[in-house]
Amino acid sequence: MHESSALSKLYNWDCSVVFIILNIYTTMLVLVTTGGTVPFEALIELVLSHESITTLSQLGFSKMRVQYGRGNRHIFTKHHKEGVMSITGFEYTDDLAGEMSRAHLVISHAGTGSVLDALRIGKHPVVVVNSKLMDNHQIEIAEELFRKRHLLVSGDTDSVGFIKALKMHREYLFETLPDPEEGILQRIIEETVSFM
């Protein structure tokens, strides 16, 4: 028996009410954070590409929220297309951790602050590195956190690596980020900086 029919008979509800309830509880949300101040247009293009949207939809996601950064709405609008997912965007929020906690998947630029925000609330983001940044320390930190199984790194804005990371995410065996008092983050940063 179909789940909605069983619920309808059990609670004597109209089927349309059951479908609304099932939709509320089965909606899977992707949050994309591209950074608040430095635009990462290539990441916006990547997540809003037909291939990415199709893959996310096939993985069961139906909603996406894109934090595109202060003053960069035109970038989001330029690449946003109506389709199989409900997609909304916003410049900035004082509660990015709250946005992340509501998401089933976080896709993030490799900025240490955003990555750590996600890890601290128990999310394991798919991280995309902006290789165009000068003196890019982000890749070293992201790769170290990947080696420790805290997140997935798709590399630069390469769609093949990104799609592979999206597909791996659900089945990947992540490790939880240790508590800050254990000093792992400080060690990672010190080790990374010492190699520069």
From Swiss-Prot:
One Pfam family, short name: Glyco_tran_28_C
InterPro entries attached to this UniProt entry: Alg13-like, Glyco_trans_28_C
Catalysed reactions, semicolon-separated: an N-acetyl-alpha-D-glucosaminyl-diphospho-di-trans,poly-cis-dolichol + UDP-N-acetyl-alpha-D-glucosamine = an N,N'-diacetylchitobiosyl-diphospho-di-trans,poly-cis-dolichol + UDP + H(+)
Localization annotation: Endoplasmic reticulum
Primary location group: endoplasmic reticulum
BP terms from Gene Ontology: dolichol-linked oligosaccharide biosynthetic process
Family, per entry: Belongs to the glycosyltransferase 28 family.
Protein name (record): UDP-N-acetylglucosamine transferase subunit ALG13
Lineage, opening ranks: Eukaryota, Fungi, Dikarya, Ascomycota, Saccharomycotina
Gene name for this UniProt entry: ALG13
